[in-house]
Amino acid sequence: MLVKDFDLLKNTKTNLNHLDMFLSPHQKKELFINSFLNSSRENKKVLYIHTPFCQQKCKYCTCGSKANFSLSEYKKFYEETLPFQIAEYNEIFNKVQFDQVYFGGGTPTIAEAQVLESVFKLIPNFEMIPNKCLEASPHTLTIEHADLLKKYKFSFISIGIQSLEKSMCTKYNRQYVSHQELSNLSTYLRNNNIYFNYDLIAFLDKGDIRDLQSFQKEINYVLDMKPSCITIHQYYQSHFSIEKTKGLISLLNNVLSHHQDYICANSMLDPNDAEMDVLYQAEYRLVSENYNYYHYMWSKYASIPVQGYNILSLGYSKEYPTVSNSDKICYVAGEDKLSYLKYDPQIHNSFLDIRQKKGLLTD
């Protein structure tokens, strides 16, 4: 059969793109599965589970999700769509031991804890996956969720705070998290030994360096809550500039001088790197424990697909397709498209260089 001829995988970009034109959706999927099963053993194997639902849609969000969904859509996704897609890739699940699983979206914790557990139980050898990650929002994460994640030994819980300014939350259609709510959440997660991250977004107000003073107060307050780490993003819809990035780097260096139990694990915070950080829209991770921890999007220049990682991405639909990759083959499920990947070595090499300089070794 044409698609089982593995010489196809050695073709050029042009030939692979030609294949996309005449292969059936079934053949494209089969080609991707064969590539995944026969890819480099050195590549980490990642399972990504997408959640297409949110409690409400933030105005700046570019992720594939919606807030106005019906109960029937919700039930169909968890009772039919996900189980079917997991079964559809049973050949991979039966032959591959995944290194990481990442639940993203959308908001995975919009599903009740028992619904999430039913998904965990559908995934073969789920408990054997060493690195388990999940995204959450503070208003959907429950005690039942936290207990479930502890039960299944999740490595990393990322919680989207984004801003502690009520006016900013209103402006961008986000639910506000009060200081008391944040304190209660942090205390519970710490007391239960759950490794958790808080996300914050810079430049949400005026979109320039005038925002830095108030943003520094937010970071200091969040760090006082003692999360395992926090991730700093710039507002993606604003104009990235060297001036703003240098200002943010200076701010973070100042913050770390007062919170010496934290280090920036994925950046040297060197102003001379600002131009490159603007180009690749850098994220900065301030970490207080388990400095060697990382997952497939941990790089300062986060990108998907990621060189060195084969990613099987489920939870897709025609409305919200997801991207899977194996070595240099990219497969967009939901759209049934194949393409050739060209990785930017600057992203991967910069990440390794930073970790080596900081003495943070990767395996």
Predicted segments with their positions:
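Canonical Radical SAM [4Fe-4S] cluster-binding loop centered on the CxxxCxxC motif
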Residues: 41-78, 170
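Conserved non-cysteine loop/helix-boundary elements of the Radical SAM core domain that shape
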Residues: 65-93, 98-262, 272-273
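Short, small-residue-rich loop/turn micro-motifs
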Residues: 51-58, 161-163, 234-236, 318
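Flexible glycine/acidic-rich beta-alpha junction loops that bind and position SAM and/or redox cofactors
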Residues: 202-210, 227-253, 263-303, 310-327
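Hydrophobic, secondary-structure "cap" segments at the distal end of domains
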Residues: 303-363
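Flexible, acidic/Gly-rich N-terminal and inter-domain linker regions that tether
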Residues: 1-46, 56
